[in-house]
Curated annotation (Swiss-Prot):
Its main location: plastid. It comes from the Eukaryota. It holds the Pfam family Ribosomal_S8. Coiled coil: none annotated. The keyword Aminoacyl-tRNA synthetase does not apply. Belongs to the universal ribosomal protein uS8 family. The lineage of its organism: Eukaryota, Viridiplantae, Streptophyta, Embryophyta, Tracheophyta. Part of the 30S ribosomal subunit. Keywords: Chloroplast, Plastid, Ribonucleoprotein, Ribosomal protein, RNA-binding, rRNA-binding. This is Small ribosomal subunit protein uS8c. One of the primary rRNA binding proteins, it binds directly to 16S rRNA central domain where it helps coordinate assembly of the platform of the 30S subunit. One of its GO terms (cellular component) is ribonucleoprotein complex. One of its GO terms (biological process) is translation. Signal peptide: none annotated.
Amino acid sequence: MSKDTIADIITSIRNADMDKKGTVRIASTNITENIIKILLREGFIENVRKHRENNKYLLILTLRHRRNRKGTYRNILKCISRPGLRIYSNYKRIPRILGGIGIVILSTSRGIMTDREARLKGIGGEILCYIW
């Protein structure tokens, strides 16, 4: 685990996806819970459970599987902001991923939200990651 929790989440999900594993275990923090709620709501993951192990809370994610074939859906997750280089955007300049098919997760003054929610509320923030 590094100090960049967002990169840890994205890397864990990407590695489990490439290794064709069905579940991922991630340390539970407020930021990780908010990002996972967005991924669950947008349909990129199937299920989330909170588990306590040795006085630490873990989130157990179930990745979304294809109906007829074995393996998970291929989601591309890309971390944008990092501790050494933060990327900020106002609501007018938030990028659209694949013409609106993908999502951008932002950290705003009103919490972590998707690009669509930020545009509707008219607020910008730090661009955390792209998912498509």
